[in-house]
């Protein structure tokens, strides 16, 4: 087993044990009712910013600054993000329709790095319907998909579009980025601006590859579980 294959195998296992399968149809339906397509989401965030506001319940100069940075990052990533051959091959195998619903906010730094990649992946297969909803407007759903007790975002939910059952989830960031922040916090005791800069550099160097690998692993697990349920 190569190092690359071993890494992907570990990701698949971790997602298999982490994925919940309990129903939350009401919360999902409410979120979908006020969700946006990718371009519409970006327009809402931009218009809010131009009006001197940010999405979410909390307004601050810091969040305005982060929103402005995110706009520039997402504009760049929308143009430069490329899917690997492995990702395209895996996505082509999805012959059933899926809903990808992401809970996020316009000022979320990880969201700016993750959303363009997810959008490219969804564009690669018409069976994937990609939607985004604001976290703070959908607290009921967010409370059902916490990460270690926190409302971490972005949070991707893979949903069956016919019955609105949650099939899997991912987020808020790829494991390499998780490890970077965890190690920095262990050494320095806090997550400061240096840590945030290091995180953005990690994303830049990775070029969305690890995000793709983890989402492919997630969808593989979703597909495998669906096939097992048919047996």
Regions found by a protein language model. Give the residues of each.
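A short, hydrophobic beta-strand/beta-hairpin element that forms part of a small beta-sheet core
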Residues: 154-169
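Thiol-based oxidoreductase modules, predominantly thioredoxin-like and allied folds used
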Residues: 101-105, 127-141
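Mid-length scaffold segments of soluble, non-membrane domains
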Residues: 105-111
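Cationic, low-complexity basic patches in intrinsically disordered or flexible, solvent-exposed regions
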Residues: 4
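Typically the conserved alpha-helix immediately C-terminal to a functionally engaged Cys/Sec
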Residues: 112-122
């Amino acid at each position: 087993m190569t190092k690359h294959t071993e890494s992907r195998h570990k990701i698949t296992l971790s997602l298999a044990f982490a994925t919940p399968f309990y129903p939350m149809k009401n919360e999902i339906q409410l979120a979908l009712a006020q969700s946006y397509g990718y371009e519409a989401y970006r327009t809402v965030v931009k218009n809010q910013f131009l009006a001197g506001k940010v999405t979410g319940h909390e307004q601050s100069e810091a969040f305005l600054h982060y929103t402005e940075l995110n706009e520039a990052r997402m504009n760049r990533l929308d143009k430069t993000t490329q899917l690997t051959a492995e990702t395209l091959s895996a996505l082509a195998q999805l012959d059933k329709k899926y809903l990808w619903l992401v809970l996020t906010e316009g000022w979320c730094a990880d969201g700016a790095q993750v959303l363009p990649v997810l959008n490219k992946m969804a564009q690669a297969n018409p069976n994937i319907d990609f939607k985004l909803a604001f976290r703070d407007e959908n607290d009921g759903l967010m409370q059902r998909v916490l990460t270690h007790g926190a409302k971490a975002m972005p949070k991707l939910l893979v949903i069956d579009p016919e019955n609105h059952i949650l099939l899997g989830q991912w987020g808020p960031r790829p494991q390499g980025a998780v490890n970077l922040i965890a190690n920095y916090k262990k050494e320095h005791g806090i997550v400061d601006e240096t840590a945030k800069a290091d995180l953005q550099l990690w994303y830049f160097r990775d070029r969305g590859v690890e995000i793709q690998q983890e989402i492919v692993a997630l969808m593989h697990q979703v597909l495998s579980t669906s096939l097992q349920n048919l047996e």
